[in-house]
From Swiss-Prot:
Acts as a sulfur carrier required for molybdopterin biosynthesis. Component of the molybdopterin synthase complex that catalyzes the conversion of precursor Z into molybdopterin by mediating the incorporation of 2 sulfur atoms into precursor Z to generate a dithiolene group. In the complex, serves as sulfur donor by being thiocarboxylated (-COSH) at its C-terminus by MOCS3. After interaction with MOCS2B, the sulfur is then transferred to precursor Z to form molybdopterin. This is Molybdopterin synthase sulfur carrier subunit. One of its GO terms (molecular function) is nucleotide binding. Disulfide bonds: none annotated. GO terms for cellular component: molybdopterin synthase complex. HAMAP family: MOCS2A (MF_03051). Heterotetramer; composed of 2 small (MOCS2A) and 2 large (MOCS2B) subunits. The modification Glycyl adenylate is found at residue 96. Keywords: Cytoplasm, Molybdenum cofactor biosynthesis, Nucleotide-binding, Phosphoprotein.
Length: 96
């Protein structure tokens, strides 16, 4: 069974490609567990999140409260992404 990969591309000749993992409510809002995102070189994790919200406006619901992880380590929104990095979008998880 082939897995469909969602790609979001930005028009720029000098770019990096990263894998974005979506968890919990972010996954529900987008309908995808992961995707490939092409961004200009030097982009921050915040710029990546901005691009995701443009593609999936419903993510605005969780944008202000997500935690970002870059290559399995929590990070800030000013971290620079590199080619083949993995960016996780982790909304708060509630339950009982």
């Amino acid at each position: 069974m082939d897995k469909e990969v969602t790609k979001i591309e930005s028009d720029d000749t000098s770019s990096v490609e990263i894998k974005v993992l979506l968890f919990a409510r972010a996954r529900e809002l987008t309908g995808v567990p992961d995707l490939t995102l092409k961004m200009p070189s030097g982009s921050t994790t915040q710029k990546c999140l901005d691009e995701l919200v443009l593609k999936f406006p419903s993510l605005e619901e969780v944008r202000s409260c997500v935690v970002l992880a870059l290559n399995e380590e929590y990070t800030t929104d000013s971290a620079i992404v590199q080619h083949r990095d993995e960016l996780a979008i982790i909304p708060p998880i509630s339950g009982g």
